[in-house]
Amino acid sequence: MSQQRTLNNTIRATGVGLHSGNKIHITLRPAPVNHGIVFRRVDLDPVVEIPASGDLVTEVILCTGLTRNGAKVQTVEHLMSAFAGLGIDNAIVDLSSAELPIMDGSSAPFVFLLQSAGILEQNAAKRFIRIKRSVEVRQGDKVAKFSPYDGYKLGFTIEFDHPMIPHKQSHYEMEFSTAAYIKEISLARTFGFMHDLEDMRERNLGLGGSMDNAILLDDFRVLNEDGLRYGNEFVRHKILDAIGDLYLIGGPILGAYEAFKSGHALNNKLVRAVLADETSWEWISFPSSAAEQPPVVYTHPACI
């Protein structure tokens, strides 16, 4: 049986908000079966709970943000990506601010936190969303698409007119699994261009950004002294973001995702398009008595 998962223990961390620049405290807690991922704004009175749901997405410029009852939580994509990568179905995320900490700009610190807390398999079958027929959304020349597939596969193409992002480094595909996610995706950092930085600061965005938590490029080169973690780190980070954005669909996915120049807005548009068309997907579980077995996607917790 492919079982639901939560954390074995509570774990805490502190970091800086990418856009606010504020110090943020985050606490990750176990949650019961079928609870899902829920963010809690514990700095508010009363505390506001915000489920990790695609239909609550209200912010898609430079991050993915959720809003419920007037309370916001922004920059959820990297933690959601880590949850998806390790197969965590149920968790409570307490926040002292309206934004998650950016950590080092990748999801690797969140993966480390989850591994440190331990992963607990629960006595209930994991519920997958299986794509039954293709769904595609477009915005100008940008495209994002889901197709039926026995497993979870992601392919992404970016297009930037920059010498550090040549065409041969602009496409990446991966067969999703916990091991592949940790090794190939989790270390890829968010990135930005110097010429965009001033505009962002004028809009009170990117106030916590630095070369400690992002790749920064001028017109010709990467400015970070340590360079890149992968030769194609830019497109790998886009897949990292997509994995987090798509996990807001409400569960792990069985299907193939293909994207060209997609971002948070189009990823959310795809999630909403799938959920709005009940003929395009179905819930499926793989109890121990089932004749059909789940694709090998998630590594056993003892091996993570």
Curated annotation (Swiss-Prot):
Keywords: Hydrolase, Lipid A biosynthesis, Lipid biosynthesis, Lipid metabolism, Metal-binding, Zinc
Coiled-coil regions listed: none
Endpoints of the signal sequence: none
Cofactor(s) needed for function: Zn(2+)
Positions that bind Zn(2+): 78, 237, 241
Pfam family, one: LpxC
UniProt-recorded Gene Ontology molecular function terms: metal ion binding; UDP-3-O-acyl-N-acetylglucosamine deacetylase activity
Pathway named in the protein's UniProt entry: Glycolipid biosynthesis; lipid IV(A) biosynthesis; lipid IV(A) from (3R)-3-hydroxytetradecanoyl-[acyl-carrier-protein] and UDP-N-acetyl-alpha-D-glucosamine: step 2/6
Keyword Lipid metabolism: yes
Domain of life, per lineage: Bacteria
Catalytic activity: a UDP-3-O-[(3R)-3-hydroxyacyl]-N-acetyl-alpha-D-glucosamine + H2O = a UDP-3-O-[(3R)-3-hydroxyacyl]-alpha-D-glucosamine + acetate
Annotated GO CC locations: membrane
Family membership noted in the UniProt record: Belongs to the LpxC family.
Purpose of the protein: Catalyzes the hydrolysis of UDP-3-O-myristoyl-N-acetylglucosamine to form UDP-3-O-myristoylglucosamine and acetate, the committed step in lipid A biosynthesis.
Protein's name according to its UniProt entry: UDP-3-O-acyl-N-acetylglucosamine deacetylase
